[in-house]
Amino acid sequence: MSGIWKLKVPGKIKHFLWKVCSDCLPTKVNLMKREILANPTCHLCGRIAEDTKHALWDCEAVKAVWCMDFSWVNWVEAAHGSFLDLVDRLVSKPRVAELFATTAWSIWTHRNKSRLLEKTIPLGSIGEAAKTFLQQFRSCRDEPSSSRGKLIR
């Protein structure tokens, strides 16, 4: 889990991933445990209790997002582990982990907006939006090549 803090993603995404790995996201199951909600059913698929892994990975509504850019993931193996196991496997590959974290954060953001009936992008566009967001973040962090090595007097 310590690899999370080394990822080159915005702080809000690192914090989100830490919450995911600590199982303290306010999923419906976690809210039910705190006696805030009575019904833990996922509002996206309407069939299964919404825990962290379901909300971000197992829900039929979000699987298509992962299939687009993460088709190489062993789905059978991923189905048996926790979301933390999945994160641990990916953090060893920083560029992949950064896209994974940004995509998961984008799915969670979509879930929250749709639950509150706010405007969202279609689920099928989340993968591309996550890539664009990450590219923009990286370009903002990079120093302009023209200013390197020049001394202004």
Task: Please identify what each model-predicted range represents.
Residues 1-153:
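Primary recognition of RNase H-like, Mg2+-dependent phosphodiesterase/nuclease domains
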